[in-house]
């Protein structure tokens, strides 16, 4: 299944806010933000073509394995005879010809889907789906149609337009295990084609009979296929109407306790789609009781499971403080620490940092929990040394923590070394991240100023000195000429507030050079040509 078939247009909350409250600081995911799935995996999940099985894997009705692709051309030569068999009134010829078509459509590479469609047999296969008296023929026809629907959108459209979808939904109640399983697979392929096709399948009432396949008596192959199809029912943008997919939540809560990696993977992806949205959707996911197990799965050895579990947790903490607290209370912070500090791939670390950034956008108790879990030090390490995509997310995590944190929490973060890497990112190419880092530094400077006012630091803003020592002052000065007006204005404001007064105090009384700089908050303030320079 493709995670990004349609461009998400959601903008990060709190793009350039000066003061960040918990709601503003949380950020929904952007489409291009976390590239965590290989295209091969995306494609195989969106649609699956049923290929030939070994003799010991064949379902009850599959009489023989698939021919080698080298015989395809020879098979196509006999296409007229196969078509004749399909349209015959002879039951055995119908089955034999349909089976030949199924084999042809099941070859490993480039099956001749277009040629089969052009042969005009699709309506006949759909008709065969209704043959309750002949489940073996139903099965072969369903398999052939499944593989046609695994092709292009145009191929899928042909299957839909010949009326197969409502019949496949009816076949979910078939007496035959194999027919039911093939119907599940076919519906997964149709739903996986596009949100429009997904909604068509849901509109035919497919969800409830699909969920009934997920029982304790189901074979593993059925569990895998039904869970995969369920994930396709939940996938895609625009999202399906939540009321249509909400009934899947109790089943997903059971499925994430499976020991099978494929079932776990697709169940977690389904939860990641359902939790990607408004707080009421997030609340429904929480109330389904999935959070404890999702947190456990953050330590799963397989990235295929870990990634969608992390995505789900990350989505949940975009909710309100209570929803975020549910994740914290179930021990997610220690798992996130492990993801930051162990040798996980870039995409996982990036996703973990994004998740933490939404936790640090919470209240002070939640920021304290992040500090006590030991997350600040590894965040600083990533902020300093990781690839830029990870640095960006770590910068959000630190900046959000400074926005909502107490003075003591900010002092702790400074002690952990946040100042230098924040300063270093002021020269990065991303204006949003420059702004995020400026906000973080400004929040730190405010605490330093408060300490200075109380006389605790000998009339010196110790944090301003730290920023200067980290070459941050020079970088802030240079931002006065930045193309982005918000960055320029913020840089000027920081320089006015935390360095100009210091410069003024060093000038001798009556020094004429002080006359043009009336910046004490008056409206007549003017920035000197070229900006401030305090070096």
UniProtKB/Swiss-Prot annotation:
Entry annotated with the keyword Metal-binding: no
Ranges of the ARM repeats in the UniProt entry: 67-106, 110-150, 153-192, 195-235, 237-276, 279-318, 321-361, 364-403, 407-446, 461-500
Occurrences of domain IBB (ranges): 1-58
Basic and acidic residues composition-biased segments: 20-46
Phenotype of null mutants: The impa1 impa2 double mutant exhibits root growth inhibition under salt stress and reduced NLS-mediated import of nuclear proteins. Salt-hypersensitivity is exacerbated in plants lacking also SWO1.
Protein origin, superkingdom: Eukaryota
Biological function: Binds to conventional NLS motifs and mediates nuclear protein import across the nuclear envelope. Involved in the maintenance of cell wall integrity under salt stress via interaction with SWO1. Acts as a cellular receptor for the nuclear import of the virD2 protein of Agrobacterium, but is not essential for Agrobacterium-mediated root transformation.
Protein family (similarity comment): Belongs to the importin alpha family.
Record-given protein name: Importin subunit alpha-2
Organism the protein comes from: Arabidopsis thaliana (Mouse-ear cress)
